[in-house]
């Protein structure tokens, strides 16, 4: 399950593992969820009966991505402390921490009492149109959708011109799937906040790392 960040459906897990779709698989997934190894969610844009299962245990993720295939390299971790390999892990780990602290994020946004669902969404691109992927989507019963971008940085995060364009594309792609009554709030979840600048005005809501541990 560590091979796909967004997770897998029951059918995909059954096909990959050879386990039949039945009580045994259901019990296994339920036990893993109860132990906080995985979480489940309904992917936005798919039938409500569809459930995705996503690995969220940080040790398992780190082991499978960066240790399992380098078991004989005793110095792999220390040799790569400043490499792009572990920098990529920082981003992955921060996103998983966000998934694990959904209730705290709701609290920081001031919507702890609003019924919500957490999801992810992606649409494939075509020759005419670029695709889009959103890894953290909060769909609220008050007709607001928080499109969340999770960014790990060692200082306040700076939004570039190119990134603002990417964010606007994601907003427009998502807007095309919503009802006219729904509005989108671009929400940045970062370690130390968003740096004020020419392109930061696109952000409507912010959540900082410190908010996740209150």
Q: How would you describe each model-predicted region?
A:
Residues 1-3:
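Short helix-to-turn junction characteristic of helix-turn-helix DNA-binding domains
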Residues 5-16:
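Short acidic, hydrophobic short linear motifs in intrinsically disordered regions
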Residues 7, 19-22, 142, 157:
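Alpha-helix boundary/capping and short turn/kink residues
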Residues 18-35:
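Short amphipathic alpha-helical interaction segments
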Residues 31, 39-214:
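A cross-kingdom feature that marks ATP-driven nucleic-acid transaction machinery
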């Amino acid at each position: 399950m560590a091979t796909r960040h967004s997770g897998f459906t029951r059918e995909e897990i059954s096909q990959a593992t050879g386990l039949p779709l039945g009580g045994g698989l259901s019990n296994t997934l339920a036990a893993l969820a109860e132990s906080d190894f995985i979480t489940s969610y309904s992917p936005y844009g798919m039938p409500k009966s569809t459930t995705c299962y996503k690995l969220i245990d940080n040790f398992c993720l780190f082991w499978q991505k960066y240790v399992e295939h380098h078991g004989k390299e005793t110095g792999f971790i220390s040799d790569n402390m400043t490499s792009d390999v572990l920098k990529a892990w920082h981003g992955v780990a921060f996103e998983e921490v966000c998934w694990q602290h959904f209730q705290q994020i709701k609290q920081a946004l001031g919507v702890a009492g609003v019924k919500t669902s957490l999801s992810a969404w992606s649409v494939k691109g075509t020759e005419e149109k670029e695709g889009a992927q959103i890894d953290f989507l909060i769909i609220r019963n008050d007709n607001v959708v928080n499109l969340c971008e999770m960014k790990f940085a060692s200082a306040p995060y700076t939004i570039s011109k190119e990134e603002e364009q990417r964010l606007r594309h994601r907003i427009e792609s998502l807007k095309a799937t919503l009802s006219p009554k729904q509005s989108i709030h671009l929400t940045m979840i970062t370690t130390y906040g968003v740096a004020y600048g020419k392109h930061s005005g696109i952000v409507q809501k912010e959540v900082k790392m410190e908010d996740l541990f209150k």
